[in-house]
Amino acid sequence: MERILENAMYASRWLLAPIYFGLSLGLLALALKFFQEVIHVLPNVFALSEADLILVILSLIDMSLVGGLLVMVMISGYENFVSQLDIDDSKEKLNWLGKMDSSSLKMKVAASIVAISSIHLLRVFMDAQNISTDYLMWYVIIHMTFVVSAFCMGYLDKVTKH
């Protein structure tokens, strides 16, 4: 009975595979939205103010960071919790494949969240004259919460590894 239960629990990790595949569909949706934004802005690039162009570029950078986060979570999560990727040696291989454990994945996710939050905060500050002080204050508080959380996670990770 114990063996059957253990084998069933171990096999249940494959339930994560469609979830990680779903993230790839999310990445596809993000790529479509990225190029929709590029196609939308290119014909109007000369009519945009410098501030508006910077906001569009920040939005594109934000999408690229989210895309990188999706790839990292999708591939590392699959490798850590489901199965190793069998990538042919003749194909291009990411140098971090097989090297990122769940702890380093958490740190990279935390750093990505801080970077994404920073871009959002910069976008808010670029339009600060149209935004209430309370909204700005809460945005900074939330961002600092992400920063402090990432710092604490890194510190705890360093302390537990030594």
UniProtKB/Swiss-Prot annotation:
Compartment(s) of residence: Cell membrane
Residue ranges crossing the lipid bilayer per the database entry: 15-35, 53-73, 136-156
GO cellular component term, pick one: plasma membrane
Disulfide linkage: none
Primary residence: membrane
Species of origin: Pseudomonas putida (strain W619)
Pfam families tied to this protein: UPF0114
Keyword Calcium included in the entry's annotation: no
Name of the protein in question: UPF0114 protein PputW619_4503
NCBIfam families with a match to the protein in the record: HI0507
Membrane topology value: Multi-pass membrane protein
Record has Repressor as a keyword: no
Keywords on record: Cell membrane, Membrane, Transmembrane, Transmembrane helix
Family designation: Belongs to the UPF0114 family.
